[in-house]
């Protein structure tokens, strides 16, 4: 390193940047400013100072400048927006997302069910994963890290929201309403006693901050304008916190953690994890497609639902391959018994009775997928082997891949070897 930089105190930012640019000028250097928003909070003029430094000193030097920040709204405002002094000077931007389940599972080396249940709590946020050791008792770790008043994640959503928005209580109420099962715009507004027009800006902000996501059926040609959109909590830990911590804050403040542990025992696997498993299955299918283990090129992977006079129709995983004119419909079962052919027959019936699907994808071949934690009955295995349109995935193994979905790269190894 530069010993002078270790000894000298600079009173002027430009002098510091000039020294960095002039240090071994023939060599490429990377200058990283971490937590840029907090620097701006302490010195509101810093974006203008940095603009001047870039234009006058760094732009034509051998320096790559990287600005990092965990506050999305402030990075947008002070580094990316049209009003920022730095506007127009970036060469690229990276918005880091949580790690996908498939990437984590491939390196963690723990049983599939443990990985799914841990991911349902932590998502793919590396900092959260530091507190959850693979293979350790998950409920004990939840108790220590999340339910304890001294736990690192006990107040995490409070810290995240208060750093990003004003009137955090209003946003908390919206997230709580969604956590309670209100997913349609009208139902969320009704639960809060708000007009939908007043609610929409709050929802947009929460989506921009990755707290929420708006999902639409894969049949929608213009998802942004769709009136069938449903709102969900996008972050696994935030969803967990609002389900198992926020409603019991009073009890937890009195060190009564047992009430939450009882709730976890009652429905964590059957309801909470089973819901997360649907997103994991979408990730698994996307990974199989990317690795070309499955000959399917999806333009979109999501879900499908329809409420009409014939009742409610829901399909957990749905993907469309416009190139080959094929549709994938999948059902996800996270329970302790093998999936029987009855599940396949019900899925097939859902697809066949949907006039909307036939209209949206005329002439498309339908491929069916069943994702199971606990395998399949012999009747289901026999059914798949005689068909060219059924994909079976048990935990981390592709048990059956129909010939129509195979290519030269198609194999039947554990999924962790496919990703």
Language-model-derived ranges and their functions:
Residues 229-419:
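A cross-kingdom feature that marks ATP-driven nucleic-acid transaction machinery
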């Amino acid at each position: 390193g530069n010993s002078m930089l270790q000894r000298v105190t600079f009173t002027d930012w430009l002098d510091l940047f000039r020294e960095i640019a002039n240090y071994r000028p023939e060599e490429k250097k990377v200058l990283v400013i971490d937590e840029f928003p907090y620097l701006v909070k302490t010195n509101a003029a810093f974006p203008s100072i940095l603009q001047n430094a870039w234009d006058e000193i760094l732009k034509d030097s051998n320096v790559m400048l990287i600005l990092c920040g965990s506050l999305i709204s402030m990075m947008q405002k002070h580094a990316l927006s049209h009003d920022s002094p730095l506007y127009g000077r970036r060469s690229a931007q990276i918005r880091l997302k949580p790690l996908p389940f498939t990437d984590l599972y491939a390196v963690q080396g723990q049983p599939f069910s443990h990985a799914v249940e841990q991911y349902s709590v932590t998502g793919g946020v590396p900092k959260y994963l530091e507190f959850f050791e693979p293979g350790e008792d998950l409920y004990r770790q939840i108790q220590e890290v999340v339910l304890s008043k001294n736990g690192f994640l006990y107040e995490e959503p409070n810290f995240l929201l208060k750093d990003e928005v004003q009137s955090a209580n209003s946003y908390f109420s919206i997230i709580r309403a969604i956590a309670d099962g209100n997913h349609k715009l009208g139902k969320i507004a009704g639960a809060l006693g708000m007009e939908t027009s007043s609610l929409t800006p709050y929802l947009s902000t929460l989506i921009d901050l990755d707290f929420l996501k708006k999902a639409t059926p894969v049949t929608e040609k213009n998802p942004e304008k769709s009136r069938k959109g449903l709102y969900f909590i996008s972050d696994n830990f935030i969803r967990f916190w609002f389900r198992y911590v926020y409603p019991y804050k009073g009890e937890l403040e009195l060190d009564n953690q047992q009430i939450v542990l009882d709730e976890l025992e009652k429905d964590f696997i059957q309801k909470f994890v089973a819901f997360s498993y649907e997103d994991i299955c979408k990730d698994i299918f996307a990974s199989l497609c990317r690795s070309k283990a499955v000959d399917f090129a999806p333009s979109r992977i999501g879900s499908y639902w329809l409420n009409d006079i014939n009742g409610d129709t829901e399909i957990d995983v749905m993907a469309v391959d416009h190139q080959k004119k094929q549709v994938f419909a999948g059902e996800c079962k996270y329970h302790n018994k093998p999936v029987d052919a009855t599940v396949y027959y019900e899925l097939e019936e859902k697809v066949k009775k949907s006039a909307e699907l036939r209209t949206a994808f005329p002439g498309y071949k339908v491929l069916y997928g069943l994702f199971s934690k606990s395998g399949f009955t012999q009747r289901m295995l026999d059914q798949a082997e005689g068909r060219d349109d059924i994909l079976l995935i048990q935990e981390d193994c592709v048990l059956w891949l129909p010939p129509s979905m195979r290519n030269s790269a198609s194999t039947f190894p554990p999924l962790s070897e496919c990703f």
